[in-house]
Amino acid sequence: MMKQMRIYCLVVLAIFFMVVSAAAFNPFGEKKDEGKKVDVDGLTKRSATLVNNVQTATISFAEGIVLVQEAVGQEAAAEQLKQSIANAKEKKGDQNATKALVSEVNNASGSLNKINFAAEMNKEKAKESLGNSILKIGVGVILDGIAAKNASDLLNESQAALKQVSFTSAGTVKDVINVSKFIAQEIPPQANSMQKFSANLIEYAKTNGIPTPSNEAVKKEADSMQEN
């Protein structure tokens, strides 16, 4: 009788552990979502929007830089950057193309920051294009700032989501984390650098009587270019 009771207890325990395991895993051994269901598609779409907006911002920076390069006689550098802009436009939403252009923009602006604009800027070319350059750079700064804030929010949400989603969705969420982490870490320094670069251009423009766009005009242009 005692032996039968022991067997009965073991069977009950085995069934209990099977039920507990089933609560945590589905029949395919995948972890179930806990609590509120994660909108993986929503996270992915927000990630894609971030990349598009950063790409738009960086293209705007690059176009503004090209105008300055041409005004200081850096024709070869301007042509090379134009090709990079065309490549980025052909690959809309491509994270690698965006990263490459971010790097090129940072290098180009760093090179131009070493130049004495008063001595090397062609004043006639500056009168024609400097206002537009300042506008494009201002647009990029605004779009970068918005993207950096949104990326920080998305990074926190996607990291929390990774603890809840199934194994089959984990890879997609990790991709979102990588995108948002890149933007949250790399884009604020770019925006700050370009803002300082723009300040130097504005100072030169004011010194030489060249009109500059208003803050309202820059914001209006940025709003028209931002993807929501």
Which ranges hold each PLM region?
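N-terminal export/membrane-targeting signals
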Residues: M1-F25
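Immediate post-signal-peptide N-terminus of mature secreted/exported proteins
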Residues: A24-D94, S224-N228
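Extended amphipathic alpha-helical interaction segments
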Residues: K99-E227
